[in-house]
Amino acid sequence: LSVSVAGGRHMFNNASMQGDIVIDMRLMRSIDIDAEKRTAWVESGCIVFDVDQEAIAHNLAAVTGQFYDTGIAGFTLGGGLGFLSPRYGLSVDNLLAVQLVSPQGELLYIDDETDPEKMWVARGAGWNLGVVIRMKLKLH
């Protein structure tokens, strides 16, 4: 059986809906902002609108997409070019950590200290590591 993960469902070829089993992340939309550290833990069902609204409420901004209905996980893990990119880089450049379930069913926390090699993979191809549950993003 093939498995795919669906977050925001903003895609051009319906890719997240092509598996025999679809893991629907839409209800996982919690955001936890640490205004002092200028970071946010964002669950993978969030869309750009969710992240922008929470960041703005703390007088902060995240590097997000240009369309509010874009899923933040797919956007970030795939690179993520947004309005703030000329100043702060791609969304993936602002990815600090990921928490995911591996294909073996292990719950993993990955950042530059715990596993720099997997964190390198997460920045651009993170969906290949497993099902990303949440991500830690740098805010500005």
Residue ranges of each PLM-predicted region?
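N-terminal glycine-rich flavin-associated loop
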Residues: L1-V3, M25-Y68, G78-D112
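C-terminal substrate-binding/cap subdomain adjacent to the FAD-binding core in PCMH-type
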Residues: Y88, L96-H140
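Classical protein tyrosine phosphatase
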Residues: L1-A6, F12
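Flexible loop/turn segments at secondary-structure boundaries
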Residues: M11-N14, F49-D50, T70-A73, L139
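Glycine-rich loop at the start of a catalytic domain that most often binds anionic cofactors/ligands
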Residues: N14-I23
